[in-house]
Every structure is written in C-alpha cells, then in structure tokens.
Amino acid sequence: MLSVACFLAFAPDSYLPMLARSFLVQWTALFLILSIVFLWYRSWWSASSALLGTALLAIQIPVPEAPEPDASTGSMLRVLHMNVWQPNESYGSAIEEALSSEADVISIQEVDRHWARELTSRLGPSYPYARIEPRSNCYGIALFSRLPFERVSTKFLDGTPLIEAWFNVGGRSVRVISVHATSPISYEHFHQRNRQLDGLVPIVAATAIPTILVGDLNTVPWDGAFGRFCSRSGLQATQVKGSRTWPSLGPLALIPLDHVLLSGRASATSITSFHVPGSDHRGLLAEIKLPRHAP
C-alpha cells in the first residue's frame, strides 16, 4: 500500500504516472478511508501505512485559495470559458448559459461547423466581435466579445489552433489567449500536449502586458508539465475551491482540466464553475481586475 502511494507521489513525470496522478485527490481520499477502516479493525500496521500514504499524497496537492480582496482601483473584465463537447446538440441551452453570464469575453472550445453556425446566430447579436476556427476533430475554437478587438490572430500549436486577441480595457491593452491542448489519451498525445505547452511559452512571454489565458489545457495543477509551463511563461494559476471541471457530474466534477491563468499583475476577484448543458466539462466564469498601474 505504501509503495502505491510512493509511486503516485514520486514516480517520474512520464505518461502512466501522469494518468494515475491526475486523480490524486481521489487517491488521497481512498487512502484516508482505508486508514479509517484499518483503525476500526485495529490493524495498526496497515492503518499506519495508509495514513502515511495519505500524507504523502496530500502534500502533492495545491491548496485552493479564495481570491484575496483587492482594494486597488482598476478596470474589471468578466471572462467566460466553456468546452461545449463537440457531439453535444444542446446548442440553445448551452448558449443561453453563456448569455446569462453577461461576460465581456467568451471562450468556447470543441467548435465544429454546427456549433459555429449556432454560436454566430445566437451569440452574434450581443457579441458582435468574433473569431471562429471550426474543426471536426474536437479542437475547433471560438472567441466572442462585446469589446472590439484591437487585433486578433489565430496561431497553431502542433497543428491545433489557438486564438490570441487584444482589447482596450479602461485605456490599456489587455490580451486574452484561448487554447485547447491535446488530450493525453495515448503516449503520443501526451507528448503532443507537452509540446503544445512548450510552444505556448514564447507566445505568452512575447509581451509584458496583462494576459489572461483560458482553456482546456488537459492537465492538472499538480502535473509537472503544468508547473513548468507556468514557471517558464510567467503565468500564475488561479485555482480556487470548486474549480474542478471534468468529468461533469451534475453539480460536481473530479479534476481541474480547465484553467484561467494570469500575468501582468492582473488578478482574479472571483472564479466560479457552472454547468454547461450537454457537455462533459463544467465551465468557468472569472472576474478579472486589471490594476491601474499594471505594466
């Protein structure tokens, strides 16, 4: 039992350990339950092993924190992100969820031509500025905005599109990047996802203006690839309690695959998850403060 915990906590950052560690919170809960069961039956050695395993796993998990109150003045930007799940045909109810958020910018992922048509028709009147890159392979992407783009472009990471948009918010430029990294469902896809995260680094680091990166990165905050990406790009994670997004199980989800990452002294005053009708992901809604004297 202790050897399993050591494997989960200290195994090299490779494909199979990465898959197992994705559910580290659930593994920790299982070890804790086992320790209670062993204590109940007075199996002291097994209980000690399970408790030690619980501790080894628990210290690997970043503790979600509530955003700190920020008394500084500055502009606010409300950003919504949702992975709609390409086969999902609940177009109207999913789009209504986005509209009801009153977000300034909406990032949508897994957009095919059917979703592109529905999004343009239903979101277009309220969000007239849009960039849509539909795909049939679950990696189509779209960005809708109430605010006009200063400029917007599509870039590619190992063949997968991302959208980079610049806005003027309160008299300063702000950048929003929407990206959907490859799901590591195989050994090759695992390496492709890591190459994409590596390729994101120079894009993010190319400017010092406040940047908001949103998307399904198909990695968890305690994954080595995620930590390296944040460290090298200068982005800061904004994990908070209740930010787990996949798989969507009604009001719950198991692991945080979708992220809101910030740089340039931008800060999140709140991040909440919400149900996306028909999708296997929960969405994220972030309130972002842009300090007056941010670079």
PLM region spans:
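N-terminal, active-site-proximal structural segment of metallo-dependent hydrolase catalytic domains
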Residues: 1-122, 292-294
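Soluble catalytic domains of enzymes that build or remodel membrane lipids, polysaccharides, and related
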Residues: 75, 79, 85-100, 108-295
